[in-house]
């Protein structure tokens, strides 16, 4: 590996850490309805844990309602049961044709808890970014030990890795601030 490929690899891995943060944030419930709310709910469909999105069409008719329309009539009760068993605090209403879920407004206490969870996810992303930095710096030091690059090149590349790290840590903080604002919005 040369310096450029180490930097590229580090940047890719840092991007993945932020992508993971985005996915975690999508699962966090805000006051608004979102199809991603039910992404992680698995339905026991013919003995196989199956995501709701593979059994039904999920849509958001308005900001406080989710509708789920299972393609198989026999799956209605299964989907309804899976939603009630999830820890999201959602109450599905099954009218035989469609399952409606009204998203209740979040309490102040629940909002504060969600902000804490968002901060925890952000911290985990920052740790992942810093781990990538450590790996990149270790790889650069190995190149220096093997006399493949000079000490000056290592110093310059280490500075580049640090700038990359600072940029991704700042991005994760921005994402966290935006998510906190979204959660606290009434």
From Swiss-Prot:
Subcellular location field: Cytoplasm
What is the similarity comment for this entry? Belongs to the RRF family.
NCBIfam families tied to this protein: frr (TIGR00496)
Which GO BP annotation is one of this protein's?
cytoplasmic translational termination
One matching Pfam family: RRF
**Gene that produces this protein:** frr
The record's annotation in PANTHER family points to: MITOCHONDRIAL RIBOSOME RECYCLING FACTOR PSEUDO 1, RIBOSOME RECYCLING FACTOR
Q: Enumerate the GO terms in the molecular function aspect.
A: ribosomal large subunit binding
Q: Which UniProt key words apply to this protein?
A: Cytoplasm, Protein biosynthesis
Q: Which organism is it from?
A: Nitratidesulfovibrio vulgaris (strain DSM 19637 / Miyazaki F) (Desulfovibrio vulgaris)
Q: What does this protein do?
A: Responsible for the release of ribosomes from messenger RNA at the termination of protein biosynthesis. May increase the efficiency of translation by recycling ribosomes from one round of translation to another.
What is the protein named? Answer: Ribosome-recycling factor
Q: Where is it found, in Gene Ontology cellular component terms?
A: cytosol
Q: What is its main location?
A: cytoplasm
């Amino acid at each position: 590996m040369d310096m450029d490929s180490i930097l590229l690899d580090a940047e890719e891995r840092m991007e993945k850490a932020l992508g993971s943060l985005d996915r975690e944030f999508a699962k966090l419930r805000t006051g608004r309805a979102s199809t991603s709310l039910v992404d992680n709910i698995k339905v026991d469909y013919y003995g196989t844990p199956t995501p709701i999105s593979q059994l039904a069409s999920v849509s958001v008719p308005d900001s406080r309602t989710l509708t789920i329309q299972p393609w198989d009539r026999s799956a209605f009760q299964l989907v309804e049961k899976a939603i009630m068993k999830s820890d999201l605090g959602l109450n599905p209403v099954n009218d035989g044709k469609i399952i409606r879920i009204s998203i209740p407004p979040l309490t102040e206490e629940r909002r504060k808890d969600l902000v804490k969870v968002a901060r925890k996810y952000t911290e985990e992303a920052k740790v992942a970014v810093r781990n990538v930095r450590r790996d990149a710096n270790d790889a650069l030091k190995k190149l220096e030990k093997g006399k493949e690059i000079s000490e000056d090149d290592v110093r310059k590349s280490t500075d580049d890795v640090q700038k990359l790290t600072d940029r991704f840590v700042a991005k994760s903080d921005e994402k966290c601030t935006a998510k906190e604002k979204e959660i606290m919005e009434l």
